[in-house]
Amino acid sequence: MLKGEESVEFQFKEKYDINDLVEIVRILRSPEGCPWDKVQTHETIRQDFIEEVYEAVEAIDEKDAEHLKEELGDVLLNVVFHAVLEEEQGRFDFNDTADDVCKKMIFRHPHVFGNTKADTPEEVLANWDKIKMKSKEQKSVTETMESVSKSLPSLIRAQKLHKKAERGGLLPKSAEEMIDDISAGLARLKESLAENSADDNSEKIGDILFEMTGLAKALDTESEKSLYNACGRFIERFDKLEKNVGKAGIKIQNVSPDVVRILWENKK
């Protein structure tokens, strides 16, 4: 039992479960709780939620089970915190959230919990699309595209849109055709730059990036992860460059940009 001048009721244990986590958040939000936790809202911890999910993804990429366990706990804490905020308003609680997702999983897996037949992952996905459209009362493929979260990173959102379009009957181009389209887009951008055109180059770049996500899908790779890995390689390459310059007792910031560029290109 917690003790103190303003003690709260809580039983310490050797091992806790999800019900304990919900109770801990309730205590933190109570009048006797934490000054910081008491004043948080959905909006103030929104960014924390996003960051925790990304940290969990990083743990997955690292294939580090202990790190993943920790980060999944942080994600779960955020889920519980948001649920407790709603519980305080009398709208729903954590159990309502669990109940809702259980019912959704049962409803979306009639091939497991019902009599629908689906022997391949492709058949499962086809069933899911039909079920989602029905449950969300979506009458067109466009509506399914509009339902893709706008808060997603744009590379992920674009690739999901390509998938929705394909399932809606828009057959994808071959990888070779997409590369030709990307080359044509780059040529238009180069022409615009040469002409000092007042055209919106961000639109041209956006079109090229969108085509690139389609190419990634055609090559069965994730555009977001591809760029993530490229960022890592960029850092590694720059680190090698900086260390090589440092061997001469010079900081890279003090080297002429033209020289840095030459050294950079030579490291390719």
Locations of regions flagged by a protein language model:
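Flexible "arm" and connector segments at domain edges
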Residues: 2-71, 77-205, 209-268
